[in-house]
Amino acid sequence: MDFRIGQGYDVHQLVPGRPLIIGGVTIPYERGLLGHSDADVLLHAITDALFGAAALGDIGRHFSDTDPRFKGADSRALLRECAARVAQAGFSIRNVDSTIIAQAPKLAPHIDAMRANIAADLGLPLDRVNVKAKTNEKLGYLGRGEGIEAQAAALVVREAAA
């Protein structure tokens, strides 16, 4: 068996006039994340981790922020397409672990829905998807509430050829 671990990262600026979508969940808040797509920072980090684990590059290589097809794109659809490309490369996704770093809003009430979305999109049992939420203890741009960051790790495996 060929086990691979991928690491993903994303950050987006918080701005007025946009919805806040994290993990495919719309979260009530006065600001949202700025981006070409729906700017779902968590799903972008997970997508990057999966592409990285399969040595398929990164999210920008597959879903460029200069491509008008992805303007306002639903990041859940992008994650599903990522999973299909990882599978096409011969890998199965085993688990995902992720962390969201945001001073506000409180994300704990939304974690279960995020996990359910990610598990559904990746075709995984819920117990193979983890999402954690942390603050930056009021330090730096994250602590000042200027943006939200996400980090993710993913394990994929390719069965040995017979």
From Swiss-Prot:
CDD domains: MECDP_synthase (cd00554). Its EC number is 4.6.1.12. It comes from Burkholderia thailandensis (strain ATCC 700388 / DSM 13276 / CCUG 48851 / CIP 106301 / E264). Its cofactor is a divalent metal cation. Belongs to the IspF family. Coiled coil: none annotated. One of its GO terms (molecular function) is metal ion binding. This is 2-C-methyl-D-erythritol 2,4-cyclodiphosphate synthase. The record marks H36, T135 as: Transition state stabilizer. It comes from the Bacteria. Binds 1 divalent metal cation per subunit.
